């Protein structure tokens, strides 16, 4: 984390993306986001009030990942301004056993006997709504940054949201 530490501090915003493995983000991204804890109690001089975009892609969808990323950002009082979720190809499409495996994604999504073809292989490039959501997220992030968002206001709003969340859980 040491080489990335200053990059996190210097960044105006974050675009965090991860694959969906078993309804959660992969371990590498999870470990990276856990390391943000070192900034948590440093008041507004490091990460508080910054902006983020969360991106998740999975064999089914990326929504569980975007929700997790948003959660990590919230704990650090970083506002997630957009979440982009898409469907990518599960590893079953390339493992070599996808057409015959009875417990894999090919069998579950398309039924027994399905042949893997380019036409049925999911890819975010084939999902115009996902690609547009990514473009829109980038534009919104650029707009917010160019308008000089107030980090203190963002941090205060994020703190309030976190306090409300904890009130509901007690």
Spell out what each predicted region is.
Residues 1-88:
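Helix-loop-strand module that forms the ligand-binding subsite of alpha/beta enzymes
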Residues 84-170:
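Glycine-rich phosphate/pyrophosphate-binding loop and the adjoining helix
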């Amino acid at each position: 984390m040491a080489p990335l530490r200053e990059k996190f501090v210097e960044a105006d915003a974050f675009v965090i993306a991860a694959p969906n493995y078993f309804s959660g983000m992969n371990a590498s991204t999870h470990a990276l986001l856990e390391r943000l804890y070192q900034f948590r109690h440093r008041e507004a001089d490091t990460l508080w009030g910054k902006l983020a975009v969360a991106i998740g892609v999975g064999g089914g969808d990326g929504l569980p990942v975007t929700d997790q990323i948003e959660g990590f950002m919230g704990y650090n009082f970083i506002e997630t301004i957009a979440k982009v979720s898409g469907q990518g190809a599960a590893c079953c499409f390339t493992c070599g056993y996808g057409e015959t495996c009875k417990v894999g994604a090919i069998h579950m999504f398309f039924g027994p006997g399905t042949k893997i073809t380019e036409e049925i292989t999911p890819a975010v490039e084939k999902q115009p709504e996902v690609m547009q959501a990514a473009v829109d997220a980038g534009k919104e992030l650029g707009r917010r940054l160019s308008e000089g968002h107030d980090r203190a206001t963002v941090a205060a709003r994020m703190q309030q949201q976190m306090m409300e969340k904890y009130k509901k859980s007690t």
